[in-house]
């Protein structure tokens, strides 16, 4: 089994907004490595390999799966919603899943910071650079789990082992 590392799927413009110091190198000429879009329908091959189908969500629904110890949970990602935050416990750990619709990006974090459990929410009036807030301090947080405004400015949340994928995956 491969070891997963924290990651976020986003677009380049959003990444640069959050990390203006970034540099990218284009190593692909489009010939040797073709760019492929994510599938919008299930192939016959995928359907054959699925086994029994879990019908709680549509097969192509986006989810963010979280795994802590022996516990796992999938959080549905609604592409019609600009920003959302799931606050839950998985495997006895307080977690939050941040969703940012314009870039179809989700990430999961531990909500515990210095023995304090934070309660996050998607703030409709916060800027896109920091669309989430915690109720306890009113601090603003980025999609990458960094506090950029408020009493916790400069602090970072700890990433959780997870994956953004389609429900059937």
Place the predicted regions along the sequence by residue:
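Mid-to-C-terminal functional-domain signal that highlights helix-capping/loop sites
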Residues: 1-169
């Amino acid at each position: 089994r491969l070891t997963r590392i924290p990651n976020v799927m986003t677009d380049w413009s959003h990444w640069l907004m959050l990390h203006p110091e970034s540099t990218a190198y284009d190593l692909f000429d489009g010939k040797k490595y073709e760019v492929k879009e994510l599938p919008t329908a299930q192939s016959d091959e995928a359907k054959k390999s699925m086994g029994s189908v879990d019908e709680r969500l549509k097969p192509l629904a986006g989810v963010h799966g979280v795994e802590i110890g022996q516990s796992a949970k999938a959080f549905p990602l609604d592409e019609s919603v600009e920003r959302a935050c799931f606050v839950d416990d998985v495997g006895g750990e307080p977690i939050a899943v941040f969703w940012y619709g314009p870039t179809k990006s989700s990430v999961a974090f531990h909500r515990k910071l210095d023995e304090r459990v934070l309660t996050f929410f998607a703030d409709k009036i916060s800027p896109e650079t920091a669309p989430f807030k915690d109720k306890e301090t009113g601090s603003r947080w980025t999609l990458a789990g960094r506090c950029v405004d408020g009493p916790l400015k400069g602090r970072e949340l700890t990433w959780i082992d997870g994956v953004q994928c389609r429900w059937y995956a």
